[in-house]
Curated annotation (Swiss-Prot):
<dbReference type="InterPro" id="IPR020568">
    <property type="entry name" value="Ribosomal_Su5_D2-typ_SF"/>
</dbReference>
<keyword id="KW-0689">Ribosomal protein</keyword>
<dbReference type="InterPro" id="IPR000754">
    <property type="entry name" value="Ribosomal_uS9"/>
</dbReference>
<dbReference type="InterPro" id="IPR014721">
    <property type="entry name" value="Ribsml_uS5_D2-typ_fold_subgr"/>
</dbReference>
<dbReference type="GO" id="GO:0003723">
    <property type="term" value="F:RNA binding"/>
</dbReference>
<dbReference type="GO" id="GO:0003735">
    <property type="term" value="F:structural constituent of ribosome"/>
</dbReference>
<comment type="similarity">
    <text>Belongs to the universal ribosomal protein uS9 family.</text>
</comment>
<dbReference type="GO" id="GO:0022627">
    <property type="term" value="C:cytosolic small ribosomal subunit"/>
</dbReference>
<keyword id="KW-0687">Ribonucleoprotein</keyword>
<dbReference type="InterPro" id="IPR023035">
    <property type="entry name" value="Ribosomal_uS9_bac/plastid"/>
</dbReference>
<protein>
    <recommendedName>
        <fullName>Small ribosomal subunit protein uS9</fullName>
    </recommendedName>
</protein>
<dbReference type="Pfam" id="PF00380">
    <property type="entry name" value="Ribosomal_S9"/>
</dbReference>
<dbReference type="InterPro" id="IPR020574">
    <property type="entry name" value="Ribosomal_uS9_CS"/>
</dbReference>
<dbReference type="GO" id="GO:0006412">
    <property type="term" value="P:translation"/>
</dbReference>
């Protein structure tokens, strides 16, 4: 009987410890006292440096608002995808600088950077972002042109006779 009581007491202590643990895990990395999270995102030839901080949902790209920087509304919607998946659409401000590549590559780099920064801010988002495929770097780049051909894969017209 005493062994049973000892075992139940141990189990109860373990359960109370588990219940007292915080629900959200503590953030992995912070870069300064103001609570900014930093990440870099890459896509094609574009590299984006992203700073994420708790705020009202403002997004600034190269010192311009997101609507000024990206002309198409579909680009803006895809950049907001990590916030929609994690249900934090108006909880973070984003400041990012992006260089290289074209508009599509820059959009992909910013998306990747925001996803990585969100993952650093709250590790609970990791599974959601991973399932959405936002933490994986899209490694597709332009194939190089080969000599003796017109393009990367296009060849000159072949004649049998």
């Amino acid at each position: 009987m005493t062994e049973l009581k000892v075992k139940t007491e141990k189990v109860e202590k373990q359960l109370t410890r588990e219940l007292l643990k915080p629900v959200l895990k503590t953030p992995k990395e912070k870069i300064d006292n103001s609570g900014k999270f930093y990440a870099t995102g890459k896509r094609k030839n574009a590299i984006a440096r992203v700073w994420l901080k708790v705020g009202k949902g403002k997004i600034v790209v190269n010192k311009k608002t997101i609507d000024q920087y990206f002309p198409s509304e579909t680009y803006v919607k895809t950049i907001l995808q990590p916030f929609v998946l994690t249900k934090t659409i108006d909880q973070y401000d984003v400041i990012c600088t992006v260089r290289g590549g074209g508009i599509s590559g820059q959009k992909g780099a910013i998306l990747h950077g925001i996803s990585k920064a969100l993952d650093k801010s709250a590790p609970d988002f990791h599974a959601i972002l991973r399932k959405g495929g936002l933490l994986t770097r899209d490694s597709r780049v332009v194939e190089r042109k080969k000599y003796g051909q017109r393009k990367a894969r296009k060849k000159t017209q072949f004649s049998k006779r």
